[in-house]
């Protein structure tokens, strides 16, 4: 009996971890942070319970979109080394279970957000889930090299959701946070595509290096990085401690530009990887700086 229980427990734990990975937790962490940032810097107050509900709905919505994405992309995930060990291509979760979970979490997160927080936040969450799941995953990703540019709209909405959870309205401040994420997304994913462009080509995904070449991709990374740097200076105009923010944001942005320039002037795998790795840490730290500078 004990040996049977000991066998069952690891299986249960592994199954839970597989479903957790289906929700793309690394993306979820960043989405939740940006949503919380929108809540914190918004004028006015929000009941702690409502803030928790809003945060959970944003997390569930992100997970729902991740599950639907993995369901639809399981065929191409199986072709790429980077993604072949994901739950569905690895045979750990069935496609039907994945889509069922994604749809259930979508309905729950949007419904609870509408009822418990407000309608505009629920509508924005529905748009974010729908845009990522349908516009990006099912249409843009396999049809245009601008897939991550347009698809980046979905990932840039959460700070607006956080803001509207408090104010029930959209303002210029929340749109600036939206723009930061929107401009960050292309250089982040283009760095990844430089690392894996042969696999994208094999899977017939029209990423920019596949359709327009490596040099054009490098130019795009540099241009978007410059525009991103300029936009990241704007939150200092409305944050309480603008000096603290700029002291954080400017060095972060210069380092981002440094990595982008290194990518532009080099064909070194490790330069591409350094750009991709730094871009993840960059956005986390930048939004933490925004939070700290709001007090």
Swiss-Prot record:
Enzyme class label: transferase
Subcellular location field: Cell inner membrane
One GO term of the biological process aspect: heme O biosynthetic process
Q: Which cysteines are joined by disulfide bonds?
A: none
Q: Which InterPro entries match?
A: Protohaem_IX_farnesylTrfase (IPR006369), UbiA_prenyltransferase (IPR000537), UbiA_prenylTrfase_CS (IPR030470), UbiA_sf (IPR044878)
Q: Which GO terms describe its molecular function?
A: protoheme IX farnesyltransferase activity
Specify the protein's topology with respect to the membrane.
Multi-pass membrane protein
In the UniProt record, which is one GO cellular component term? plasma membrane
Spell out where the chain crosses the membrane.
Answer: 27-46, 50-72, 93-115, 119-136, 148-168, 175-195, 219-239, 244-264, 275-295
Write down the EC number: 2.5.1.141
Tell me which UniProt keywords the record has, alphabetically.
Cell inner membrane, Cell membrane, Heme biosynthesis, Membrane, Transferase, Transmembrane, Transmembrane helix
Pathway assigned to this chain's UniProt record: Porphyrin-containing compound metabolism; heme O biosynthesis; heme O from protoheme: step 1/1
Q: Which Gene3D superfamilies match?
A: UbiA prenyltransferase
Main location per the UniProt record: membrane
Pfam families noted in UniProt: UbiA (PF01040)
Reactions the enzyme catalyzes: heme b + (2E,6E)-farnesyl diphosphate + H2O = Fe(II)-heme o + diphosphate
Q: Which NCBIfam families does the entry link to?
A: cyoE_ctaB, PRK04375.1-2
State the family named in the UniProt similarity comment for this chain.
Answer: Belongs to the UbiA prenyltransferase family. Protoheme IX farnesyltransferase subfamily.
State its role: Converts heme B (protoheme IX) to heme O by substitution of the vinyl group on carbon 2 of heme B porphyrin ring with a hydroxyethyl farnesyl side group.
What protein name applies here? Answer: Protoheme IX farnesyltransferase
Provenance organism? Ehrlichia canis (strain Jake)
């Amino acid at each position: 009996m004990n040996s049977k229980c000991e066998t069952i427990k690891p299986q249960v734990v592994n199954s839970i971890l597989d479903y957790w990975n289906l929700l793309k937790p690394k993306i979820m962490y960043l989405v939740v942070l940006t949503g919380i940032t929108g809540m914190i810097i918004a004028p006015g107050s929000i009941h702690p319970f409502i803030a928790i509900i809003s945060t959970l709905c944003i997390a569930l919505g992100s997970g729902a979109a991740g599950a639907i994405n993995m369901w639809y992309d399981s065929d191409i995930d199986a072709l790429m080394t980077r993604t072949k060990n994901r739950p569905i291509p690895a045979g750990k979760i069935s496609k039907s279970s994945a889509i069922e979970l994604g749809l259930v979490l979508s309905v729950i997160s949007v419904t609870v957000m509408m009822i418990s927080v407000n309608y505009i936040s629920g509508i924005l969450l529905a748009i974010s889930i729908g845009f990522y799941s349908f516009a990006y995953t099912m249409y843009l990703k396999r049809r245009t090299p601008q897939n991550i540019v347009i698809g980046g709209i979905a990932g840039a909405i959460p700070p607006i959701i956080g803001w509207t959870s408090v104010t029930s309205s959209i303002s210029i401040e929340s749109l600036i946070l939206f723009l930061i994420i929107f401009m960050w997304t292309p250089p982040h994913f283009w760095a990844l595509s430089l690392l894996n462009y042969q696999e994208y080509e094999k899977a017939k995904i029209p990423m920019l290096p596949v359709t327009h070449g490596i040099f054009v991709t490098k130019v795009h990374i540099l241009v978007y990085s410059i525009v991103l740097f300029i936009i990241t200076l704007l939150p200092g105009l409305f944050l309480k401690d603008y000096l603290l923010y700029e002291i954080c944001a400017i060095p972060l942005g210069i380092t981002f530009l440094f990595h982008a320039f290194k990518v532009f002037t080099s064909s070194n795998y490790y330069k591409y990887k350094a750009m991709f790795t730094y871009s993840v840490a960059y956005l986390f730290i930048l939004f933490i700086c925004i939070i700290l500078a709001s007090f």
